[in-house]
Every structure is written in C-alpha cells, then in structure tokens.
C-alpha cells in the first residue's frame, strides 16, 4: 500500500509504503544469515554455526538494520515512481520507520519540495538603493591614503597619535583575572585601524614610550569568544615604539610613477580617483542594499524548510569550517579552547546560519521565477571568464571545478538584486540604475580600469596595515 501526503509546514512530500511482507521476510532472513556467519561457537568452524544455534547470539537491532539497508534501494525506487513533476521535488529523501518487525515493514520517505512562499511587495520596499554623493573631502581622503601608502614610517619619541603604528605589550584581565588570548608582546598596531574592540585604540592615543597604563573596555555582544561577550575588561599596556607616517609628496612625477594608463598629472589623478570613488560607492551601495532588502523581505515572509535541506546545508558549513581550520593549521580542540565554544555551540550556529541561507536562497529563487529572470549563455560565459581572470585559472579549469548550476545561481541572484534595485532606488540615482540595467554599462573599459584600481587599492591596503 502506498500513501502520498504533502506537508506544507515542512515543505516535504511524504510517501508512505507498506512493504511486501514476503519480500521483507526474505531480506530479514538474508540479514540473519549474514549476521550468523560472524558468530563463533566452540565445536563449529567460523561461519558454519547453524542458524538455529546462532540466533541466540545475534543482535536483533543489527539484523533489522542490515535487512533494511539491503531492502532500502528497492523501496526508495518504488516510492520515487509515485512522484510527479508538479510535486517540485528538489532533493533525495530521508526516511522514517513507522513500524518494523520480522514480518512487517512500514516506512515513509520525506522528499524536500519547493516551498510555498508568499512574498511581500518587493517592488515597494522601505529599503532604498542610495549611492553616497562624492565630496571634495572624499577625493582628498583618497589622495591622502595613496600618499601615505607610498610614504615611509620613521620612529618618533612623542605621545601616540591617530595614524601612528605602535609596537606594544598588553595583558588583559576580566574580574581581575587574566584570560586566554588576552596577552601579547611586541604587537604592531595601526592606531585608527579599528583592529581591536571599540574604545581600545582611542585610549592608546596620548600614551608615551616605555610608560604603562590601564585601558578599560567592554567586549561586544557578538564577540567571537561568547564567554567574554558583554564582559568588562582591563588591559595593562606598555608602549615599546612609535612610528609615524611621512607621506610621499604629490607631484606630477609622483603621479607618473604610479604607471596608471592615461594618468600622468595631478589633475588627471583627481579625475581618476573621483571615478574610482564613484564605483566604490556604487558597489558599497549594492552590498548595503542587498543586506537590508533581504532582511526586510525575510522579516515579512515565512519559508518552510525541509529537514533534509537543513541537514545538507549544515554539513556544507561544517566542511567549510573544518577546511578553514586545516588551512590555518588550528586543531579543533585548540579552537574550542580559544573560543570557549563547545561542538554543540558550533552546530547550533551552523543550524541558524543554514536556515538563514536557505531562506534567502528561496527568496531569490521566488523573485527570479516571478520576474522571469533566467541567465543567458552569454552571461554564463562572461561569468566564467571573470572567474578565470580573478583566480588566475583558465576558462576550462573554472568550467571543470565550478558546477554549471552554481554559476547559474550566482548569475540569477545578481539579476534579482539588479531587479530589486530597479524597483527600489532613489530618484537621484535614476541615471546610474538605468546604466546598470543596460548590461552594466558602468563597467565600460572594465578590464583596464580594474587593473588600475587594483593598484590603488593595493597601495591603500598597505597603508592600512
């Protein structure tokens, strides 16, 4: 007997089977015989103990599990014949045993299906795509960063200022007790880089070489070591060295030395930096819009998620996590010791993140379906070429290592964001949005611009270290 049932609250198709009792009995007997062959009794050669005598030594649970494992492929195939296209099944099933004894087996397969989603009015979001207006101060800041990156650091004997690179020792205390990971010696820090928790670097300003001082901070609520979150801490610090930056001089000769195509004078550099800043502002606006728009939509929609999909996503996140630890040569035990996490804490985090990622992926998919957003072959090939250029691999290598489906999803998701921007942007950004919708015209001459901008960004990154 076969029974189908759609479970909208968990986005699953349940197919319940009552197995043929004769077949199940045959598989059970085969499992008994296989398990009996492992039994050793005095007076019998191994594997030659009669089944009647071996039964007393068998683990019934092991017999049932083996019988089910042998029968399962046939049962799953039988269940699959009862799936139709309109069910929108998107993954292989998990199964539950309803009833199982020597003579009877009832089993249900739970197939993940595309969930029922009722989206809010995503064409009229409160979140708006807005691009920050470029000011003269922005251009001056870009120039200053570039000059500082090309400058040099010299040791000075004066109190610490914003922008200095200091070498210092520190030791942290919570409730007047030292804590793991709270101590360091000869640590280099760029003041103003916000590398430490809020309030730490600001209190270093004004300190002098070889003098000790206490700094008081509160760990943030989302601090990676959760046992320290929201805790007040005191750091005893000692400044060893102070270096200040002497920026390069802005001259036409300096500009020419940057070797940026068609940029040889100060005025040309300013125009170039203005274009660079505009592009950075657009990308930053896209990132902010995507995050806030998805949050707004997500708060107004429930997306049922099948257990199988959640488990698969947790497995993927776990694989990435362990791969990252391996690359950084950090044993799991050491990581747990440093962060004060348990393996259950990590699993719980993965579960929350998995549900969030799956929910967002279905929101993307539903909007793409409603708006008819389908990647073209040209878009696919262009995306592969960009990935190849970015990673330094050949187009063939990218095609072989990154799945077609993964690339299609990436392209579709970007088309969804572009469509949401088209629906939800401020009037002042109309021209830029229109360009973006016309094959991303804002990326004209992109290859040369990317090369030039990468030089600037690398210089600015050096300045921030």
UniProtKB/Swiss-Prot annotation:
> Which catalysed reactions does the entry list for this protein?
[protein]-peptidylproline (omega=180) = [protein]-peptidylproline (omega=0)
Q: Which UniProt keywords apply?
A: Cell cycle, Cell division, Chaperone, Cytoplasm, Isomerase, Rotamase
PROSITE patterns from the UniProt entry: FKBP_PPIASE
Q: Which domain of life is it from?
A: Bacteria
Pfam families assigned to the protein according to its UniProt record, in alphabetical order: FKBP_C, Trigger_C, Trigger_N
A Gene Ontology biological process term: protein folding
Report the principal subcellular site: cytoplasm
Record localization: Cytoplasm
**Record region (Disordered):** 431-465
| Record InterPro entries | PPIase_dom_sf (IPR046357), PPIase_FKBP_dom (IPR001179), Trig_fac (IPR005215), Trigger_fac_C (IPR008880), Trigger_fac_C_sf (IPR037041), Trigger_fac_ribosome-bd_bac (IPR008881), Trigger_fac_ribosome-bd_sf (IPR036611), Trigger_fact/SurA_dom_sf (IPR027304)
Which EC numbers does the record give? Answer: 5.2.1.8
Its GO CC terms are: cytoplasm
GO MF terms on file?
Answer: peptidyl-prolyl cis-trans isomerase activity
Residue stretches making up the PPIase FKBP-type domain: 163-248
Q: Where is the composition biased (Basic and acidic residues)?
A: 443-465
Family to which the UniProt record says this protein belongs:
Belongs to the FKBP-type PPIase family. Tig subfamily.
Role summary: Involved in protein export. Acts as a chaperone by maintaining the newly synthesized protein in an open conformation. Functions as a peptidyl-prolyl cis-trans isomerase.
The UniProt comment on domains reads: Consists of 3 domains; the N-terminus binds the ribosome, the middle domain has PPIase activity, while the C-terminus has intrinsic chaperone activity on its own.
Recorded hits in HAMAP family, A to Z, give: Trigger_factor_Tig
Record NCBIfam families: tig
- Protein name (database record): Trigger factor
Upper classification of the organism: Bacteria, Bacillati, Mycoplasmatota, Mycoplasmoidales, Metamycoplasmataceae
**What gene is this protein a product of?**
tig
